[in-house]
Regions:
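Glycan-recognition and catalytic cores of secretory/periplasmic carbohydrate-active enzymes
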Residues: 1-390
């Protein structure tokens, strides 16, 4: 979609924004009544979530949604539930329950970092720093990157994925909080490596990239959840958008500003007519493939984050772009009430199997926890000056 065509779409207005916020916190309240201090599964089934243990990579997003609701409403029921979660996250860290992953930022930034920022709770701070230390353990000196998944001595897992750009703020925060540069240095090393190998010449993104475990040399880009190694997985593209924006906030590296614009513009240029992207950009208008609403939610948050640091003309464009994406989500994907779902955002995709990837079909045309969270974050960003959890 050409920029001039995109600019013809309406932006989310103030009235619709505040109506969406009110509805969103009603949804959060309904879900809290259902789940209490329990966690939700990664994605819904027939639009309703089931209970889950705190052993999944997505657990932090539900806690983060509770913190957003508390910030906006002041209702202590949201705070109390979120604080109960921080106790569970401490136990998870101490017992190392499913912590052999780079997703420690997804887990601990919207839960424990948020708790510390909003309440000053020292236990939450200590837990988040413990998670940052565990994330540092995943850094490979030879390759100069944080390994995504699995055992660190498994050569088959010697790779990074684009999602990790959203985990780096945990390290940036840890350096700012402790005064120890080791966290920041490793985050900066990872982002340099990741952007060098993951962003293609046309500014689309690989999902994952392998390195030689003996030498650390880059080997090849492939996909796990995209259509194919050469396609542009929609959610991967938006992890790039938001991840670059966050690293720019912490480093002010001018190269990231330039790269952000190219990566974000690729996303906009490949949007379909209704502005809800297909789960992979290989698909275009007329395809029967499912959309992934969560990709738009994350992209909107990334654009709003970066706009804080751009010259006015560019900032206005990306704020307007985010408002157009959020309006499309409000109009077409937002849950209308508890009878429809206990989530926030319909029409997400977790995994879609193809002959060219190694994931499975699950969470298709369902709510998912990151889609719910980033949709709510996008609304909050548009409604107030907000201090990010990231």
């Amino acid at each position: 979609m050409k920029r001039e065509e995109f600019l013809k779409y309406p932006e989310l207005g103030e009235k619709q924004l505040y109506e969406a916020l009110e509805r969103a916190w009603g949804q959060t309240r309904f879900a809290l009544e259902r789940f209490g201090t329990d966690f939700k599964h990664i994605f819904s089934t027939n639009q309703f979530y089931t209970k889950a243990e705190n052993n999944q990579w997505t657990n932090g997003f539900w806690t983060g949604e509770l913190w957003l609701a508390y910030e906006c409403t002041g209702d202590p029921c949201f705070r109390d539930a979120a604080m109960a979660h921080t106790v569970s996250f401490r136990e998870r860290a101490e017992r190392r329950i499913e912590t052999d992953t780079h997703d420690l930022g997804f887990l601990y930034s919207p839960s424990c970092v948020a708790a510390y920022k909003l309440t000053g709770d020292k236990n939450a701070r200590e837990t988040a720093l413990l998670a940052a230390d565990m994330l540092l353990e995943r850094f490979h000196e030879k390759g100069q990157f944080l390994q995504a998944w699995g055992s660190l001595d498994d050569p088959g897992n010697y790779r990074l994925i684009i999602d990790c750009l959203l985990n780096l703020p945990l390290l940036y925060w840890a350096s700012a909080e402790t005064g120890d540069d080791k966290y920041r240095e490793k985050a900066q090393a990872h982002v340099r490596t990741a952007l060098k190998v993951l962003i293609r010449p046309d500014y689309s993104a690989y999902h994952t990239f392998y390195f030689d475990p003996e030498t650390g040399a880059p080997l090849r880009g492939v996909t796990h959840q995209g259509y194919s190694a050469d396609s542009a997985w929609a959610r991967g593209q938006e992890w790039g958008i938001y991840g670059i924006a966050l690293s720019y906030r912490y480093t002010r590296d001018p190269a990231y500003e330039v790269l952000f614009e190219y990566v974000a513009d690729y996303f906009i240029e490949h949007l379909p007519e209704n502005l809800i992207p297909y789960w992979d950009f290989v698909f275009t208008d007329g395809s029967s493939e499912p959309r992934d609403s969560s990709a738009s939610a994350v992209a909107a948050c990334g654009m709003l984050e970066m706009a804080r640091f751009l010259p006015k003309e560019k900032a206005d464009f990306y704020v307007g772009a985010a408002k157009r994406l959020m309006k499309a989500l409000c109009d077409q994907c937002a849950v209308r009430g508890p009878e429809e779902s206990d989530g926030q955002l319909l029409h997400g995709v977790y995994g879609r199997k193809t002959p060219y990837n190694d994931c499975i079909d699950h969470g298709i045309d369902e709510c998912n926890l990151w889609g719910d969270y980033y949709y709510a974050e996008g609304l909050v960003r548009l409604s107030r000056e907000w201090n990010p959890y990231w």
